[in-house]
Amino acid sequence: MHELWLCKRIVEIIKQQATGNKCRMVKKIVLEIGQLVAVDKHALNFSFKVITQGTIAQNAELSIVEIPGEAICNSCQQIVPMKQYYDECLVCGNHSLTLTKGEELKVKSMVVE
């Protein structure tokens, strides 16, 4: 269950940013997570609630923005959606794609007090 580890890292980032900006409380965290990262959102939300207990982010709302997968076909040079690794180009059927979006995992923003 890598969601628990991810939440630990997220809380570390939150603490660093909040301390550096002299914040008292974190109200909301916005995460960007690529569709191809394979994160279970329910497990992530559960882990976040557990990990943030007793921290500056204890009652923070967790908002997850999913970034769809996208790739450039190495054959026809078209930009195509990618729902999973090893998808084929929807234009020419080639399997040689270069991923351009979908593996993101970052804290996009925080609302603090």
From Swiss-Prot:
**One GO BP annotation of this record:** protein maturation
Q: Which residues bind Zn(2+)?
A: C73, C76, C89, C92
Q: Which domain of life is it from?
A: Bacteria
Keyword presence, Transmembrane helix: no
Give the matching InterPro entries. Answer: Hydgase_Ni_incorp_HypA/HybF_CS (IPR020538), HypA/HybF (IPR000688)
GO MF term set: nickel cation binding; zinc ion binding
**Cleaved signal peptide residues:** none
Entry keyword Metal-binding: yes
State the PROSITE patterns in the record: HYPA
Q: Where does Ni(2+) bind?
A: H2
Query: What UniProt keywords are attached to this protein's entry?
Result: Metal-binding, Nickel, Zinc
What does this chain do? Answer: Involved in the maturation of [NiFe] hydrogenases. Required for nickel insertion into the metal center of the hydrogenase.
Instruction: Report the PANTHER family cross-referenced here.
Output: HYDROGENASE MATURATION FACTOR HYPA (PTHR34535:SF3)
Q: Which family does it belong to?
A: Belongs to the HypA/HybF family.
Q: What is this protein called?
A: Hydrogenase maturation factor HypA
Per the UniProt record, the source organism is Legionella pneumophila (strain Corby)
High-level lineage: Bacteria, Pseudomonadati, Pseudomonadota, Gammaproteobacteria, Legionellales
